[in-house]
């Protein structure tokens, strides 16, 4: 039944007459009207972010275009702009966002653009201005974080931006912004531990402990990127401890890579992601004290691929993406009561690219969930662009079972969250049982506008009926008494429709004019009779705001007889159903009652509960138990422990937990119900096991491989956040067979047996992925560590150059570049590059006739680099054409050629290095450098150096914000060597670091950074270059640097060998030209992955070499070991050995190299003692020795050939039986019985300062019999910044190191033209004269020695600014002159009267860059007075010059030591939060002092 209602506001005279008539007939009673009152307000701006104050008619909206906030006190009848009242100053045109308080309906906040913000505590009637010295964060969605118990406590998330980057920062208030205090800088925000009312209610016993607790996601201690983000907390707003305490998320230990955190009901959830995987680890707590990792069974969750949907007070619901090729489907999980174990509810849920999921629980009714799923999921999984067929399902038992929606016995499908056309909730409101949706009946969901109709249910989704044809926007009011709808098919409409009987019948009311509806809304609790409709009028080109009021529609208030007791949930028999131990009922208005609820209008409906007897559904698995695969039992997740004395033999039993517990909060009646949580008898055999032992606890497994040789192998190692225990290796043999092991070589499987493979290519950004290339076009790959294999058709043949076929994207995991020849029939074939966004599906051409193309995306370059591609292309697409650098940001729809002549380009950490011909010198080349991929700068060399295109260069590891490069001087076969040069922080200015560095015929260099340590490098140099030039063999010596190449020394030899004998060269432990330790380096390794050191075994290093004048052959070498970062070494075994680190260095293993053996040596006490383990009865010759790249495994693998038979064998060594417990660490103190703190240091510096700061690491106590079982780095802290010393500087451009350690100008070269700095930096006020020194890029030192800035001059045109900056008063000048002279004279007189008259001699020392004074006299005061006397005499002799110099000093021309400005890091927290953004660094000497080091532990050498 549909009636047309007259639009009353268009006929006021008629309305007046009608009211008078009714009034006279009823004697003044409230009269019933025939329709709603509708008032119109037209505005020029878009009404955004509409917000009702709950239980009121006060509504706000924002005009984002003008920054104005509009307010109405009468449900939208009258509007005015806020900004003219008291406390509203400055609000006009400054608003960015309106934020209601989540838990206090009287409060809301308006955030401004420029630091001024406003708060109301009386539902919008008055506003108070407050200021925060930061703009609202644009990165974080939640700009305000509310306390769940005290609504006065709020955290404000802001940002402070410079031209380079924005820094997220947090502030807090405890009194509704009456006062505001800084909290800390942060990476991804701060939040209250008590972040929800439900959390506050469930943690009352911890209220005092966590009431003020704040948690923050902050930057790493050494690494500014997301992989190192940490979760820290403080109970004192970081006043007692500026960095805070790191939260122990995983088994009592911190976790790195925190990317997100969220509070839901009584839970806090934190997501973490490690480098090398897209899998996330989710950690959950329900008390902010104890954390657990959430378990999703065999399902993995990925970044951007999970959505926390909501939850109850007893569970969390999470949707996890379940397809790798498409973002379009997921799996719905529900947790147990503590949020740790998740149960799969339904698969193939419908998702969109933004992560929204078609899921909504029916508000106010426990256990009813409505979801959309993809019916043709198999097709969608196979084809990324397949059209989805979506169907709707509903659950009435908390997601345990699902069934179709039914409308007149037909399946109904409704549009949900991913296609929602209004604001607020999609289907339901607090009105009990009333549910609406737009959809269609049939086999699957169809078009919203073409096929959609409005359907309604008044029994919480059990049955549905057609309400209105065509799609409509809809809202519910007065607890379900009124439903309002407006057609929403894209065409203008001039009417609304409403129902007052649960959608059975509909009436119509006319609008003033037609609009295209934008949104329809009412109060959040759906209790009001007033609605707000906003739409756009195409006729007036304005926005129309309609206030719709139904208060006069019924003349009476509902009585008791107008209500019914409505059961919120029914079982399959139609009876009230139990959930969480009770049945739920609502008292709601009958659908045909002709009344409105006015007395309790603004009261949200509350349910009534009736208890049920306990059933199996009221129980869940207890702590440390998980569901069995058939879901019928709870089995132990960790080994059980029997009561002391209970188990004497395996045949005994003991009383133990059943594995079940009653769900916390469950109200079921225990008497007469199920009791699954009663203790049960458990067998002792489940808890008894053999005790750990010595070498007998080690096991070995031998496997024979049918092939002539191992061709290559790679570990597909799980990263820290990846769940699983497998240790997978993929191996290719010389005959093209592919073998896979998932248990570190204990068993092997021959995969894809009918295919011959040529090459394995790993994705360097995702450890789970590997590609297996053939000579054909069909290629194979795995995305799950070789559990399964898939294939694609390549667009061209494989590139004949190894490693050049496939390129991968750092951020978008399915983006790839393929470079290879097409239909090549001759030798010199052109190669083309193609790209795909779908992991091999849908290849498109990038460029033809290329050498290579690469993605340039990198986190440090920002989102601007996500689509950036570099190609080295032949000019005119001719194979013989000149090479040129071509770049594009749109897959070469458009392109640029920044460098028309190049040789090659390569990536090295944050740098892009391009080699190009030198236009001024034939056969020579130069380098260009870029950090952002857009701006290029010429590289300059500080020595008389010509880089020959014929001789070549090698680009080395770059992990300390500078580039190391080897430039070849001699390219004769077996006689190659060259110069090691090092850049400044932007890669443009190179200085000599070390001469005569050894290079192999293949272009590799004896250069290696000790992993995990800052600035420690080992290199081999050719000591007899003159003889080598004449054809003699090279003699190599090993050099080491502890300050990133600024100073090099020989390695100190041990005093005695492993047998306790002294060395023939007679050294006392100090290195000399005749006696030092020399190590075989990178160029001699069979496997370049066998590095000296391990990033996880901090400070431990192995090497094979000898003590003497130079390096001898491996046949005469021994194996040496260092436990202090290469400062001191000892011989541990005679002969050459392979080595590996296990469990982060708690197990060290050696096996003989180059000779038959059947045993290994191992140490569990950092190399102090060694034991022997025999792994085989037969001897083998070891070809390689390996373990997982992170060195965290307890398994090792020997790759060998059996002696006498030439059979290939692999031998697994399993050390896991050596110990039976995990080490305990107290992160707060950093130490425990199982751990001690270790600090790296420089051998010539005191106080363990290294690069301006002191680092602390956890190292396992060698005496503790436990396992680290930790995949994260062991950094404990990075403490105070140290004063600058000589070791914090290196030689500047055009300067070189002298024999005494100082830096001097290279003979024949001019001083750098320092004034060029002003030209390159037009806003610069001053420049500094060259001193010969520059700060090492990674140092963070402050104060102390100032070797790089002595004398400054004003830049042209900035004289006045310079004088203002350095101007001083006359008093300062006076004291600057008089006081030093007075002190010098007085001190000189005292020395003259007390000293014995014996002068000493001054020499330049090597320790700390200080001058040391030695004296033959016995006076203890001589070290100071000598300098003072020298100063006094000098002052007398050159007094006129002194006055001039002092004048310049006082007026700023001479830079005073210690006046470098504010400390770059005042605290550890400031150090940790520094951003590593180099995008806008120009070609100058700006060293970006103090930036954190970012270790790329897998940075292999690039060579050309």
From Swiss-Prot:
Name a GO CC annotation attached to this entry: cytosol
**Chief site of localization:** Golgi
BNR repeat ranges, renumbered to this chain? 70-80, 118-128, 394-403, 455-465, 739-749, 1120-1130, 1161-1171
Q: Name one Pfam family in it.
A: Sortilin_C
Location of the region described as Disordered in the Swiss-Prot/TrEMBL record: 1485-1504
Q: Which residues does UniProt assign to the signal peptide?
A: 1-31
Residues that carry a glycan: 313, 338, 986, 998, 1281
Q: Where in the cell is it found?
A: Golgi apparatus, trans-Golgi network membrane; Prevacuolar compartment membrane
* Transmembrane portions of the chain: 1371-1391, 1424-1444
Regions of this protein lying in the Lumenal compartment = 32-1370, 1445-1504
Membrane topology annotation? Multi-pass membrane protein
Q: GO terms for biological process?
A: Golgi to endosome transport; Golgi to vacuole transport; protein targeting to vacuole
Q: What CDD domains is this protein classified in?
A: Sialidase_non-viral (cd15482)
- Is Transport one of the keywords UniProt gives this record? yes
The text of the family note is: Belongs to the VPS10-related sortilin family.
The record's annotation in PANTHER family points to:
SORTILIN RELATED (PTHR12106), SORTILIN-RELATED RECEPTOR (PTHR12106:SF27)
The identity of this protein, by name, is: Vacuolar protein sorting/targeting protein 10
**Organism, scientific name:** Talaromyces marneffei (strain ATCC 18224 / CBS 334.59 / QM 7333) (Penicillium marneffei)
């Amino acid at each position: 039944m549909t009636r047309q209602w007259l639009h009353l506001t268009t006929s006021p005279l008629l309305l007046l007459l009608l009211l008078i008539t009714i009034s006279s007939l009823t004697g003044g009673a409230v009269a019933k009207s025939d329709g709603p009152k509708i008032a119109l307000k037209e505005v020029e701006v878009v009404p955004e972010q509409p917000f009702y104050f709950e239980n009121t008619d006060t509504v706000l909206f924002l005009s984002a275009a003008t920054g104005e906030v509009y307010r109405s006190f009468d449900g939208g009848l009258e509007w005015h702009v806020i900004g003219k009242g008291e406390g509203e100053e400055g609000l006009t045109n400054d608003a960015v966002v309106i934020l209601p308080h989540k838990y206090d309906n009287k409060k809301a906040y308006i955030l401004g653009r420029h630091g001024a913000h406003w708060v109301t505590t009386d539902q919008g009637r008055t506003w108070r201005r407050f200021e925060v010295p930061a703009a609202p964060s644009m990165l974080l969605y939640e700009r305000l974080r509310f306390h769940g118990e005290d609504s006065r406590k709020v955290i404000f998330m802001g940002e402070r931006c410079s031209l380079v980057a924005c820094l997220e920062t947090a502030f807090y208030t405890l009194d509704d912004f009456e006062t505001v205090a800084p909290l800390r800088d942060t990476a991804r925000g701060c939040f209250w531990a008590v972040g929800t009312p439900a959390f506050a209610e469930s943690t009352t016993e911890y209220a005092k402990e966590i009431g003020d607790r704040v948690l923050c996601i902050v930057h790493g201690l050494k690494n500014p990127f997301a992989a190192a983000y940490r979760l820290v907390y403080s109970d004192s707003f970081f006043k007692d401890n500026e960095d805070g305490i790191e939260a122990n998320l995983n088994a009592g230990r911190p976790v790195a890579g925190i990317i997100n955190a969220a509070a839901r009901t009584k839970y806090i959830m934190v997501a973490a992601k490690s480098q090398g995987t897209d899998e996330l680890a989710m950690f959950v707590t329900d008390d902010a004290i104890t954390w657990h990792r959430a378990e999703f069974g065999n399902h993995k969750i990925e970044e951007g691929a999970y959505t926390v949907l909501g939850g109850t007070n007893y569970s969390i619901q999470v949707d996890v993406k379940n397809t790798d090729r498409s973002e379009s489907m997921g799996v719905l999980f529900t947790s147990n009561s503590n949020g740790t174990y998740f149960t799969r509810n339904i698969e193939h849920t419908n998702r969109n690219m933004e992560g929204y999921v078609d899921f909504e629980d029916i508000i106010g009714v426990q256990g009813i969930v409505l979801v959309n799923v993809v019916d043709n999921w198999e097709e969608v999984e196979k084809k990324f662009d397949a059209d989805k067929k979506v169907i709707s399902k509903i659950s009435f038992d908390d997601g345990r079972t699902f069934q179709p929606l039914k409308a007149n016995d037909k399946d109904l499908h409704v549009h949900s969250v991913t296609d929602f056309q209004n604001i607020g909730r999609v289907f339901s409101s607090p009105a009990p049982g009333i549910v609406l949706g737009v959809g269609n009946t049939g086999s699957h969901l169809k078009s919203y506008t073409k096929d959609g109709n409005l359907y309604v249910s008044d029994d919480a989704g059990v049955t549905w009926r057609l309400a209105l044809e065509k799609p409509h926007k809809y809202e519910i009011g007065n607890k379900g008494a009124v439903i309002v709808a407006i057609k929403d098919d894209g065409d203008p409409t001039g009417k609304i429709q409403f129902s007052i009987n649960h959608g059975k019948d509909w009436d119509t009311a006319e609008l003033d004019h037609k609009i295209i509806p934008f949104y329809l809304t009412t109060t959040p609790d759906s209790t009001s009779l007033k609605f707000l409709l906003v739409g756009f009028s195409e006729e007036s080109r304005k926005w129309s705001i309609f206030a719709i009021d139904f208060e006069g529609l019924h003349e009476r208030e509902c009585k008791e007889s107008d209500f019914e007791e409505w059961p919120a949930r029914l079982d399959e028999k139609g009876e009230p159903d139990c959930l969480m131990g009770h049945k739920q009922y609502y008292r709601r208005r009958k659908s045909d009652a002709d009344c409105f609820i006015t007395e309790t209008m603004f009261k949200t409906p509350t349910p009534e509960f009736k208890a049920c007897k306990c059933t199996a559904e009221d129980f869940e698995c207890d702590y440390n138990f998980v569901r069995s695969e058939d879901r019928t039992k709870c089995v132990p997740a960790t080994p059980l422990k029997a009561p002391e004395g209970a188990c004497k033999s395996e045949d005994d039993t003991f009383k133990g937990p059943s594995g079940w517990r009653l769900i916390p909060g469950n109200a079921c009646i225990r008497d007469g119900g199920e009791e699954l949580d009663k203790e049960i008898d458990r067998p002792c055999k489940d808890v008894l096991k053999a005790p750990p032992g010595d070498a007998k606890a080690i096991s070995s497994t031998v496997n024979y491989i049918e092939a002539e040789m191992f061709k290559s192998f790679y570990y597909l190692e799980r990263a820290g956040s990846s769940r699983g225990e497998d240790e997978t290796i993929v191996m290719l043999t010389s005959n093209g067979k592919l073998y896979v092991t998932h248990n570190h070589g204990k068993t092997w499987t021959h995969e894809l047996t009918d295919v011959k493979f040529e090459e394995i290519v790993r994705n360097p950004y995702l450890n789970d992925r590997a590609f297996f290339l053939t000579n054909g076009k069909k290629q194979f790959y795995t995305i799950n560590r070789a559990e399964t294999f898939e294939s694609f058709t390549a667009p061209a043949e494989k590139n004949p150059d190894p490693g050049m076929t496939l390129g991968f994207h750092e951020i978008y995991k399915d983006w790839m570049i393929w470079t290879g020849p097409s239909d090549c029939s001759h030798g010199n074939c052109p190669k083309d590059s193609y790209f795909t966004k779908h992991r091999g599906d849908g290849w498109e051409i990038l460029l033809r006739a290329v050498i290579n193309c690469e993605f340039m995306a990198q986190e440090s370059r920002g989102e601007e680099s996500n689509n950036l591609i570099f190609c080295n292309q032949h000019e005119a697409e001719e194979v013989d054409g000149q090479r040129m650098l071509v770049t594009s940001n749109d897959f070469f729809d458009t392109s640029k050629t920044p460098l028309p002549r190049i040789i090659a380009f390569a990536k090295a950490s944050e740098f892009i290095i391009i080699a190009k011909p030198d236009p001024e010198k034939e056969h020579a080349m130069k380098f260009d450098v870029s950090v952002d991929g857009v701006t290029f700068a010429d590289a300059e060399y500080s020595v008389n150096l010509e880089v020959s295109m014929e001789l070549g260069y090698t680009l080395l590891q770059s992990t300390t914000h500078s580039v190391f490069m080897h430039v070849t001087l001699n390219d004769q076969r077996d006689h190659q060597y060259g110069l090691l040069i090092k850049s400044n922080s932007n890669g443009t200015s190179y200085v000599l670091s070390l001469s005569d560095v050894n290079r192999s015929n293949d272009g590799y260099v004896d250069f290696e950074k000790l992993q995990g340590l800052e600035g420690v490098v080992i290199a081999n140099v050719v000591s007899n270059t003159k003889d080598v030039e004449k054809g003699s063999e090279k003699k190599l010596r090993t050099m080491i640097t502890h300050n990133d190449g600024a100073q090099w020394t020989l390695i100190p030899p041990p005093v005695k060998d492993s047998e306790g004998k002294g060395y023939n060269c007679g050294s006392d432990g100090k290195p000399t030209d005749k006696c030092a330790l020399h190590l075989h380096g990178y160029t001699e390794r069979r496997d370049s992955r066998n590095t000296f050191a391990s990033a996880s075994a901090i400070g431990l290093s192995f090497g094979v070499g000898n003590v003497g004048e130079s390096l001898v052959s491996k046949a005469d070498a021994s194996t040496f070991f260092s436990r202090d970062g290469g400062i001191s070494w000892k011989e541990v075994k005679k002969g050459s050995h392979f080595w590996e680190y296990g469990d982060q260095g708690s197990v060290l293993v050696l096996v003989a190299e180059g000779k038959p053996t059947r045993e290994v040596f191992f140490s569990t006490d950092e190399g102090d003692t060694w034991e022997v383990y025999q792994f085989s009865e037969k001897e083998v010759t070891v070809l390689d020795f390996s373990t997982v790249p992170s060195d965290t495994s307890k398994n090792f693998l020997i790759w060998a050939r059996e002696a006498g038979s030439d059979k290939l064998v692999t031998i697994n060594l399993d050390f896991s039986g050596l110990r039976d417990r995990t080490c305990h660490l107290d992160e707060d103190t950093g130490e425990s019985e199982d751990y001690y703190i270790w600090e790296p240091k420089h051998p010539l510096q005191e106080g363990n300062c290294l690069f301006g700061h002191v680092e602390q690491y956890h190292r396992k106590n060698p005496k503790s019999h436990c396992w680290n079982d930790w995949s994260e780095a062991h950094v404990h802290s990075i403490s105070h910044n140290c004063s600058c010393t000589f070791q914090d500087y290196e030689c500047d451009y055009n300067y070189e190191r002298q024999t005494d350690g100082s830096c001097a100008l290279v003979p024949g070269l001019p001083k750098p033209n320092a004034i060029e700095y002003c030209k390159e930096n037009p806003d610069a006020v001053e420049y500094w004269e060259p001193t010969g020194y520059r700060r090492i890029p990674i140092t963070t030192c402050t104060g102390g020695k100032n070797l790089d800035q002595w004398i400054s001059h004003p830049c042209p045109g900035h004289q006045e600014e310079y004088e203002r900056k350095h101007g001083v008063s006359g008093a300062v000048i006076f004291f600057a002159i008089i006081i030093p002279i007075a002190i010098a004279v007085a001190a000189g007189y005292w020395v003259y009267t007390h000293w014995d008259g014996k002068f000493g001699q001054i020499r330049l020392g090597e320790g700390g860059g200080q001058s040391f004074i030695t004296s033959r006299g016995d006076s203890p005061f001589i070290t100071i007075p000598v300098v003072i006397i020298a100063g006094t005499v000098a002052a007398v002799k050159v007094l006129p010059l002194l006055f001039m110099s002092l004048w310049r000093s006082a007026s700023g021309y001479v830079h005073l030591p210690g006046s470098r400005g504010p400390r770059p890091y005042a605290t550890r927290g400031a150090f940790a939060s520094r951003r590593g953004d180099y995008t806008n660094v120009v070609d100058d000497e700006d060293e970006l002092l103090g930036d954190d080091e970012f270790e790329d532990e897998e940075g292999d050498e690039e060579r050309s």
